Swiss-Prot record:
Task performed by this protein: May act as a carrier of hyaluronan in serum or as a binding protein between hyaluronan and other matrix protein, including those on cell surfaces in tissues to regulate the localization, synthesis and degradation of hyaluronan which are essential to cells undergoing biological processes.
One GO term describing the cellular component: extracellular region
GO MF assignments: serine-type endopeptidase inhibitor activity
Family per similarity comment: Belongs to the ITIH family.
Originating organism: Mesocricetus auratus
Pfam families assigned: ITI_HC_C, VIT, VWA
Post-translational changes noted in the entry: Heavy chains are linked to bikunin via chondroitin 4-sulfate esterified to the alpha-carboxyl of the C-terminal aspartate after propeptide cleavage.
Modified residues (Aspartate 1-(chondroitin 4-sulfate)-ester): 702
Domain of life: Eukaryota
GO BP: hyaluronan metabolic process
Gene from which the chain derives: ITIH2
Descriptive protein name: Inter-alpha-trypsin inhibitor heavy chain H2
Key word Glycoprotein present: yes
Chain positions carrying an annotated carbohydrate: 118, 263, 445, 578
Modified residues (4-carboxyglutamate): 282-283
Length: 946
């Protein structure tokens, strides 16, 4: 993204080239002593005129040259954050108490990546407002006014991690001036939290100083923290109010608290107020927020095992790295190497005019190898030139060769991290040629990250290089903080959790989707995708996410209703109803700017340029193609906010640069062909549902068992009366390597002297696939070898590999598919949380077509061999509605009772009555042995048979 360095310096000089502001033409500011809380983007005395722009001078100074003569009456900042979209308004009111005219400067810092949306200045009742024009038009208007002596100077400059907005006005004695600046930015998640910074530098004591930060997050607030950034001076001043979905931070120091010391006349308010927070994430599918024709999809899954990584560090050791840069880089690398996981592989390439490698091949991150690599790095002595081309090609060769020779874990990710402080001086010098060489040689499973130290390096080149090869670039400032900056960046990419993440929105009425395909997802971050939809054609927006975790393929589905947010947004005055539109525009324009820098032909670049220009004008955003013209009502006095050539990529603060791909539906492996057994329950989305078969083997509450015996076409039922915590063997088939066990939970209290029990947890073990699956009433956990993946009942998702598929239907059911021929279905039974007795429990269903080995056993497994039964002598029972009969089975003659049991597959709330013959005494005589023979010690223990 183009960093807009817009510095407005307005010089209202009382000389020939400037216009004067008459002292007798101003009006009093109404409500001067009242700092009232207002709705987002609404402040007094200002014409609402939303526009975008940015600016950047080198330094920020005090509000005026004469501190004693000008009073800062109020300095007020308000930020409102709605679902990561922040709008900040800075308002300053000053009074000239001097008998002479005074220059007053409004100089504020805003975060890089922010868009200025409006600037308004009121001096002596004359109001200056802003409009967005195409850049050449804006410059022409500025030039016309300048020729008449009716403008100020036009200055463009850069700063470090902040951008400056600066304007100056000369006001007559007794005059009052008000400045107001609006800017917007998106909050990117880094290392597990969002960080909102407000730079406070009023330059003098303010009679009224007030900062309010309102945060509205629909997912709910997980934590909120305001670190001490003023060295304890304002301890206890910030007031934090944390709610479930809305929080407030206020900072209102009195004049006495603002003083640097008790008798000081200068302010201690000079720094950043920082607010850190994170949101709840109950659904692995992410949060899909849909409103007013736009949608935004936030995706930050947790509880996933890290994917092993193959990482090559490519370090510039040329002469320009001498001193503090090299020392800080070495210190950072030592810490980074210690943080590598044992399953990672790594090596180090260092280069000046020559290229060296610590190891010619990737090695495992053992303690011995890490210690040796740290010794190697400590001995580096910077000298010579910079051969970036050969260093990158060497690193690419090492990874390519390891991949071609099968030395890399197929489930791993490959990363190259380049650290350099300058442009090439040796070897290939042409940047476009280096970019082409890297693109031609790097495999499409490798991500290239570039860290540019200082300002001597061509940062725009590094960003093109990384964006084109599935990575990002970041500037590192060459100072004593270099080490922590390097370590912080590494921490952001140190934990890959998913590969090949793709967001699909298959509905035809969903359009203009931002980048929706990403090479990797890293823990602690967040992927954000936005788009448009036609509310007249859609009642809901469907999302399907496909991704790969450790040894597992994922398909995550969600549906979001159109009216879910309307009621909430309309009732909260601090919630921005346009947040979805603003987020979509922010992402789209920044991604287009990055695509423009990578455009392979002039024609493509012109097309992208045209799109950016139109969007910039439509959404009032100052980009490299537009400018902000600020003028009075007559239009004869103007100043210009322009954007100088500056670093740009997508998107400032983002960890991902993705691509756009066409949306697809659920992949074929996640939607097996419907069969009679597949119909045990609906899998995935509604369109995948099919009709359940009439006959399956199932276990529900009590727990009661319903066994369908196809030879006799009878349903046989029995209950098991055991204790909470006991684990029962349901299927134990060591020959096939299949196990199903269930752990009992009890009701909240006994009824009629009996405590009812239910299945609260089920364990499935597929030994040949080395896969264990634990399903509880809370979540679903897949353990595949050494990796663990968790899903929640709040997800609709598919997870699996070529042999095992887990399909979760939100809040209802889980289906396990083994080798596309064996099926296991689990239903979740929810009860009212405040029910005095009942608890949530699970039901399990097995189709009789599952093909176990002849040695299969367990309370359910033994009936897969379909024993013969004979029911005769049907007669009236003690209850006229429940007749009795005699049943011969396995050499036993039993008395059974005709009754009804519930089948919850088609009606999970009330169930469907199923007629069956009930066997008393915990199935004695119908099952082999006693039910206690089926107790096992662990959830994944096979049944030991005599």
């Amino acid at each position: 993204m183009q960093r807009l360095a817009c510095v407005l310096i307005w010089l209202f000089l009382l000389e020939e080239q400037a216009f004067e502001i008459p002292a007798n033409e101003y009006s009093e500011f109404a409500g001067y002593s009242n700092l009232v809380e207002l709705a987002p983007d609404k402040f007094p005395f200002v014409q609402e005129n939303r526009r975008y722009q940015r600016s950047l001078p080198e330094e920020s100074g005090e509000m005026t040259d004469n501190v004693d003569q000008v009073t800062l009456y109020s300095y007020k900042v308000q930020s409102t954050i709605t679902s990561r979209m922040a709008t900040t308004i800075i308002q300053s009111k000053l009074v000239n108490n001097s008998p002479q005219s005074q220059n007053v400067v409004f100089d504020v810092q805003i975060p890089k990546g922010a868009f200025i949306s409006n600037f308004t200045m009121t001096v002596n009742g004359i109001t200056f407002t802003s409009t967005i024009r195409e850049k050449t038009v804006g410059r022409a208007l500025y030039s016309q006014a300048r020729a008449k002596g009716k403008t100020a100077g036009w200055v463009r400059s850069r700063t470090l991690d902040m951008e400056n907005f600066n304007t100056e006005v000369n006001i007559p004695p007794g005059a009052k001036v008000q400045f107001e600046l609006h800017y917007q930015e998106m909050k990117w998640r880094k290392l597990g939290s969002y960080e909102h910074k407000i730079h406070l530098q009023p330059g003098r004591l303010a009679k009224h100083l007030e900062v309010n930060v309102w945060i509205v997050e629909l997912q709910g607030m997980r934590f909120l923290h305001v670190p001490d950034t003023f060295e304890g001076h304002f301890q206890g001043v910030p007031v934090i109010s944390k709610g479930q979905k809305k929080s407030h931070v206020s900072f209102k120091p009195t004049v006495a608290q603002q003083r640097k010391c008790p008798n000081c006349t200068y302010t201690a308010v000079d720094g950043e107020l920082v607010v850190m927070y994170d949101v709840n994430r109950e659904e692995k599918v992410g949060e899909l927020e849909v409103f007013n024709g736009y949608f935004v999809h936030f995706f930050a899954p947790e509880n996933l095992d890290p994917i092993p990584k193959n990482i090559l560090f490519v370090i510039d050791v040329s002469g320009s790295m001498w001193g503090i840069k090299m020392k800080q880089t070495v210190e950072a690398m030592k810490t980074i190497l210690d943080d590598l996981r044992t399953e990672d592989q790594f090596s180090v390439v260092d280069f000046n005019h020559n290229v060296r490698t610590w190891r010619n091949d990737l090695v495992s991150a053992t303690k011995t190898q890490i210690t040796d690599a740290k010794r190697y790095i400590e001995k580096i002595q910077p000298s010579g030139g910079t051969n970036i081309n050969e260093a990158l090609l060497r690193a690419i060769f090492i990874l390519n060769e390891a991949s071609n020779l099968g030395m890399l874990n197929p489930d791993s990710v490959s990363l190259i991290v380049l650290v350099s402080d300058g442009d090439p001086t040796v070897g290939e010098l042409k940047l476009s040629k280096i970019q082409k060489n890297v693109k031609q040689n790097i495999q499409d499973n490798i991500s290239l990250f570039s860290l540019g130290i200082g300002f001597d390096v061509d940062y725009d080149f590094l960003k093109r290089l990384s964006n084109e090869n599935r990575g990002i670039a970041q500037r590192i400032y060459g100072n004593r903080d270099t080490s922590s900056q390097l370590k912080k960046f590494y921490n952001q990419v140190s934990t890959p959790l998913l590969r090949n993440v793709q967001f699909n929105y298959p509905q035809a009425s969903v359009t203009d989707v931002t980048q929706n395909s990403f090479h990797n997802y890293f823990g602690g971050s967040e992927i954000v995708v936005a788009g448009k939809y036609d509310p007249s054609k859609l009642a809901e927006v469907q999302s399907i996410i496909t991704a790969t975790s450790t040894n597992t393929e994922l398909v995550l589905e969600t549906l979001s209703q159109m009216d879910d947010l309307e009621d909430f947004l309309s009732k909260d005055k601090h919630a921005d109803p346009n947040f979805t539109k603003k987020l979509w525009a922010y992402l789209t324009i920044n991604q287009l700017l990055a695509e423009r820098s990578l455009a392979p032909t002039a024609a493509i670049k012109r097309k992208i340029t045209k799109t950016i220009l139109q969007m910039s004008l439509d959404h009032h955003i100052v980009t490299p193609l537009t400018a902000m013209v600020i003028e009075n009502e007559a239009g004869d006095e103007r100043m210009l906010a322009d954007s100088p050539p500056q670093d740009h990529s997508c998107c400032s603060g983002a960890l991902y640069y993705g691509t756009k791909v066409a949306s697809a539906s659920i992949p074929s492996w996640a939607s097996p062909s419907p069969t009679p057994v597949m119909a045990m329950l609906a899998v995935g989305a509604n369109r995948l549902e099919s009709t359940p078969p009439p006959h399956v083997i199932r276990v529900e509450n009590d727990p009661h068992f319903i066994i369908y015996l196809p030879k006799s076409q009878k349903n046989i039922c029995f209950n098991i009366d055991s204790e909470p915590g006991k684990i029962l063997s349901l299927v134990s088939d060591p020959e096939s390597g299949i196990l199903v066990n269930g752990q009992l939970i009890g009701a909240k209290k006994a009824e009629n002297g009996k405590l009812r029990t239910y299945f609260g947890k089920l364990g499935f073990y597929f030994q040949k696939e080395d896969m264990k699956i634990e399903i509880s009433t809370e979540n679903i956990t897949l353990i595949n070898g050494s990796s663990t993946t968790s899903l929640f009942w709040s997800d609709t998702a598919h997870l699996g590999n070529q042999r095992v598929l887990i399909s979760v239907k939100k809040g209802k059911s889980v289906t396990l598919t083994l080798n596309k021929e064996m099926f296991f279905s689990v239903l979740l039974h929810h009860v009212w949380k405040k029910h005095p007795v009942n608890v949530d429990f699970l039901g399990i269903y097995l189709p009789p077509t599952n093909k176990f080995s002849p040695s299969a056993h367990g309370l359910l497994g033994q009936f897969m061999n379909k024993p013969n039964i004979h029911i005769f002598n049907e007669r009236p029972g003690k209850d006229p509605e429940k007749p009795e009969a005699s049943m011969e089975v396995k050499g036993h003659k039993l008395t059974v009772t005709r009754g009804l049991q519930k089948d919850y597959r088609t009606d999970i709330a009330f169930g469907t009555d199923v007629p069956c013959w009930f066997v008393h005494n915990s199935g004695k005589g119908f099952i082999d042995g006693h039910y206690k023979d089926y107790l096992v010690p662990q959830l994944y223990s096979f049944l030991k048979r005599p």
